[in-house]
Amino acid sequence: MSRTLELAKDLIARKSVTPDDAGCQELLISRLEPLGFSIERLRFGDVDNFYARRGNTGPLLVFAGHTDVVPTGPVAQWHTPPFTPTVKDGMLYGRGAADMKTSLAAFITAIEAFVADHPDHPGSIGLIITSDEEGVAINGTVKVVETLKARNELIDYCIVGEPTSSKVVGDMIKNGRRGSLSGKLTVKGIQGHIAYPHLVKNPIHMAAPAIKELSETIWDEGNEYFPPTSWQISNIHGGTGATNVVPGEVEILFNFRFSTASTAENLKQRVHAILDRHQLEYDLAWELSGKPFLTPRGSLVTAISSAIDQAFGVTPALSTSGGTSDGRFIADIAGQIVEFGPLNATIHKLNECVAVADIEPLRRTYQLTLEALLK
């Protein structure tokens, strides 16, 4: 059994349902301390995090990831117990196998091999590990980044081990992510009996033309790396449940996924302008959960692309698709950041798994990237 597979199984066996770390981080720390890493355990609220660093000079390459996993769903529907890592028909099964305990294991064994070959390597290696990525993400990576930023400890290169591969491992690198801006819009009217329309103001009717305009607005055209910004409604709530009462207000929840071609402030201004033009009485609360970030082609993208080609025989595409990740926090202090990891076909699903044959090439990818950037 490879060292990476063995460590991945040890991690999967720990029931670290978010935000519980279940001892995963101490296991990782026990492998890093003998290599000369300094360890900062950073607990915020009920969340365990740590920052590890080996070296005091630049450039600093940081691996980032999370030990927490999502709940299993109906255990009886799993082919194997979700926290009993099982190798079957060439696949490693278990909750967190793809998202993202195999990546964590590959980080560690790649670093171990690199340090063994280059004990006096230039630059520094770091890790940011949290147990709060799958949950509310308020006491995890964002707080670690705030700690580093407060002392002006900046990152040159960062690799997040998210499962980015689509059809075969190595086919996709995330070199950026869209921003996420949510709104809670409450349009106010006058409640009353549905049989007396002259005595009421129906907020649903009033809001409808504005909703139509918002849904048809072209917010931007995107750019080379990002698709156009999208605006989508997720929920509409209005009414008392009775069929003879016009509601006094309607609540509309919506979300922007926006590119670097737009800013959160510009999008807010344009939404308010549309609502005001339709002469609505409304309240609007905003939540910015992540700004867009982008790493253009450069030394990090070149290094990891070459490593993937050597390890997997695949030429990766660059993509900014998908949801948000902790990369949105790290981008605030990182010069270059990418995400790369296993296939994402089974993440958050029953019978989550990775191919055993992909595990050592993943470790080799991370090791080759280290060698390209820190030799």
Curated annotation (Swiss-Prot):
<dbReference type="Pfam" id="PF07687">
    <property type="entry name" value="M20_dimer"/>
</dbReference>
<dbReference type="Pfam" id="PF01546">
    <property type="entry name" value="Peptidase_M20"/>
</dbReference>
<feature type="binding site">
    <location>
        <position position="99"/>
    </location>
    <ligand>
        <name>Zn(2+) 2</name>
    </ligand>
</feature>
<dbReference type="InterPro" id="IPR036264">
    <property type="entry name" value="Bact_exopeptidase_dim_dom"/>
</dbReference>
<keyword id="KW-0028">Amino-acid biosynthesis</keyword>
<comment type="subunit">
    <text>Homodimer.</text>
</comment>
<dbReference type="InterPro" id="IPR011650">
    <property type="entry name" value="Peptidase_M20_dimer"/>
</dbReference>
<dbReference type="GO" id="GO:0050897">
    <property type="term" value="F:cobalt ion binding"/>
</dbReference>
<dbReference type="InterPro" id="IPR005941">
    <property type="entry name" value="DapE_proteobac"/>
</dbReference>
<feature type="binding site">
    <location>
        <position position="66"/>
    </location>
    <ligand>
        <name>Zn(2+) 1</name>
    </ligand>
</feature>
<keyword id="KW-0479">Metal-binding</keyword>
<comment type="pathway">
    <text>Amino-acid biosynthesis; L-lysine biosynthesis via DAP pathway; LL-2,6-diaminopimelate from (S)-tetrahydrodipicolinate (succinylase route): step 3/3.</text>
</comment>
<dbReference type="GO" id="GO:0006526">
    <property type="term" value="P:L-arginine biosynthetic process"/>
</dbReference>
<feature type="binding site">
    <location>
        <position position="99"/>
    </location>
    <ligand>
        <name>Zn(2+) 1</name>
    </ligand>
</feature>
<feature type="active site" description="Proton acceptor">
    <location>
        <position position="133"/>
    </location>
</feature>
<dbReference type="GO" id="GO:0008777">
    <property type="term" value="F:acetylornithine deacetylase activity"/>
</dbReference>
<keyword id="KW-0220">Diaminopimelate biosynthesis</keyword>
<dbReference type="GO" id="GO:0019877">
    <property type="term" value="P:diaminopimelate biosynthetic process"/>
</dbReference>
<keyword id="KW-0170">Cobalt</keyword>
<dbReference type="GO" id="GO:0008270">
    <property type="term" value="F:zinc ion binding"/>
</dbReference>
<dbReference type="GO" id="GO:0009014">
    <property type="term" value="F:succinyl-diaminopimelate desuccinylase activity"/>
</dbReference>
<dbReference type="InterPro" id="IPR002933">
    <property type="entry name" value="Peptidase_M20"/>
</dbReference>
<feature type="active site">
    <location>
        <position position="68"/>
    </location>
</feature>
<feature type="binding site">
    <location>
        <position position="162"/>
    </location>
    <ligand>
        <name>Zn(2+) 1</name>
    </ligand>
</feature>
<dbReference type="GO" id="GO:0009089">
    <property type="term" value="P:lysine biosynthetic process via diaminopimelate"/>
</dbReference>
<comment type="similarity">
    <text>Belongs to the peptidase M20A family. DapE subfamily.</text>
</comment>
<comment type="function">
    <text>Catalyzes the hydrolysis of N-succinyl-L,L-diaminopimelic acid (SDAP), forming succinate and LL-2,6-diaminopimelate (DAP), an intermediate involved in the bacterial biosynthesis of lysine and meso-diaminopimelic acid, an essential component of bacterial cell walls.</text>
</comment>
<keyword id="KW-0457">Lysine biosynthesis</keyword>
<feature type="binding site">
    <location>
        <position position="134"/>
    </location>
    <ligand>
        <name>Zn(2+) 2</name>
    </ligand>
</feature>
<keyword id="KW-0862">Zinc</keyword>
<protein>
    <recommendedName>
        <fullName>Succinyl-diaminopimelate desuccinylase</fullName>
        <ecNumber>3.5.1.18</ecNumber>
    </recommendedName>
</protein>
<feature type="binding site">
    <location>
        <position position="348"/>
    </location>
    <ligand>
        <name>Zn(2+) 2</name>
    </ligand>
</feature>
<dbReference type="InterPro" id="IPR050072">
    <property type="entry name" value="Peptidase_M20A"/>
</dbReference>
<keyword id="KW-0378">Hydrolase</keyword>
